[in-house]
Structure formats: structure tokens, C-alpha cells
Amino acid sequence: MKYGAVLLSSLLTTSVLATSGEIDCAQAATNYEVNHCASIELEQAQEELQRYLKTSLDLNQDDRELSQAISNAQQSWEQYYEAHCQAILTKWREGTIRTTMALTCKTQLTKQRTHELWASFLTYVDNTSPELPEPQM
């Protein structure tokens, strides 16, 4: 019981620190800080991916076949994403860097996928401006 109270207190303290913005990601040094910052970067990349995916689907909603193809490709990509980054986690399974490496893998693949969506479905072959700005890799 005492251990549970200490654990709960520790988790609450960690949660408060994480949400209060006290971690300076530019100065992250501990595994916790680095992983916390990597998680934030991944979350931001995933939000951007969802925005580009939604825009790709919305823009092509009148073409059911294309919309379905985009959705199918996304599902296949998600399976690859999970399998590949799990392999990265396995590669580093003996080290404390494993979580950071897996998060970095997910962030990189997410940014690549966002760029693929942009290049494939949100740009034009002529000089028409793209539907969204080019995402940063």
C-alpha cells in the first residue's frame, strides 16, 4: 500500500511537471526529458499528418475510388509504421535509448508520410498553389 502511494505521488508529480512546461526540450538531458520531448514532437507530427490526410480526403471526396485508395494506403502505411518502429525498438531493446529510438522512428516516418500525402494529393502539375504548405521533413 505504501509503495502504491509513493508511486501515485511520483506519477502525479511527473504529470504536473510535464504539463506545466518546466522541461526545456533544448536542454533535455535525462532519459525522461529526452523521451518527453520526443513524445511532444511525435504528437505534433501526428497532428500535422492528420490535417494533411483529412485535406487529401476532403479534396477528393467526390472521387470515391480515389478516397478509398488513399484510405487503404494509409491503413497499409500504419501497419508498416508500427512494424518498422517495433523492429527499431527491438534492435535497441537492451539499452536505455530504446524508447527514444522508437519515438524518433515514428516521428521520422510520420513526417515522411505527411510529405508523401502533400506531394501526391495536395499539389498540382502546373503552377497552381498547393492546397497546404509543404510540410517540413
Each language-model region and where it sits:
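N-terminal signal peptide c-region/cleavage motif recognized by signal peptidases
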Residues: 13-16
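N-terminal alpha-helical modules
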Residues: 18-137
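Sec-dependent signal peptide recognition
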Residues: 1-9
